[in-house]
Structures are given as structure tokens and as C-alpha cells.
């Protein structure tokens, strides 16, 4: 975890010893079968080095699961620069399904699966409406969230956030929705 405050919260409330992201270098290559990053990748730098480190830490059949906001989503397009999931300056990177697949490929991964996170659109839309100081922000956010949810039912790549499952190249091939 990059945030010292989040690490302290995890320790205080759950007695978890959460390490900073810089501790990745302390693990031996091939230490993990699965690594998960739930809304973390967009915060990490340097990005290329991080992908290489994650790859080295996985076993040969290891899996990398990454959940990130989708800047080509229905709600991102509706709100434009006001979209709350841009979360500048905390979000250093913004991904589309295509760009994250390219990053994975560049660093020796194939995208094995991708899944929408349909409920993120409700939260992000409500937060965006609140930040824009619109009246009835909750209601407006729920309406946009509902429209975004239906849009993602038709085309998963329109989901506000996506979960991507990567495998090292040489393992399972192709994308499964």
C-alpha cells in the first residue's frame, strides 16, 4: 500500500501488517501465485518498473489481477474532465481496456480475462455530481450510474472500472469475458 495513512488504518483496525509498495523489492522472484491490485495500479510509479517487478514476483503460472478505473467508460465520457475517477493528482495513470492490455503485453503478460465492476459507476457518478456541486447530486449520480450500468451490460468495455486478469506469456491464451 502506497499510503502510510491506509497502512496505519489497516494495522489499527484489523491488526494487518501492510507493507509499503517499496517493499516489493524485498521478495524473492517467483514468490507469489497471485498478486492483486484493487485500485492501486493508477497510483504507482514508476509504472514500467512496477509491471516488471510484479512479473518477476509471480511464479511461471502466476496470475496478476488488476482493477482500475476505465477512462473510456460511459460515465467518463459523460462527465469529461469532471469525472471523479480521474482523481488528480492521486491517480497518476489512466487506463482504457486497450491501454492496459498493451501495458501487460509490453511486460510479458497476456490478458486472460476481463470483468466489469458495474457498481463503481454509481459511486463515481455520485461523487462527480457532488464535486460539481449540482443540486440533487445523489439522485443525479444514481441516474447516471444506472445509465452507465445498462451501457456496460451491452458492452463491458464501457464499465466505469474493470478487473483484468493477466497471465505470463506462454500460459493460457486469449481473452475470456
PLM segments and residue spans:
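Short glycine/proline- and charge-enriched loop/turn segments
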Residues: 79-88, 127-134
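A C-terminal cap/extension of S-adenosyl-L-methionine-dependent methyltransferases
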Residues: 113-177
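Short, Lys/Arg-enriched charge-dense amphipathic segments
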Residues: 1-3, 87-92, 134-145
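Short hydrophobic/aromatic-enriched beta-strand-loop microsegments
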Residues: 18-20, 85-86, 114
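N-terminal start-of-chain detector that recognizes signal peptides
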Residues: 9, 65-66, 84, 134-140
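Conserved SAM-binding loop
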Residues: 1-79, 92-109, 119, 161-169, ...
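Residue-level signal for well-ordered alpha-helical segments
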Residues: 69-72, 77-81, 86, 139-145
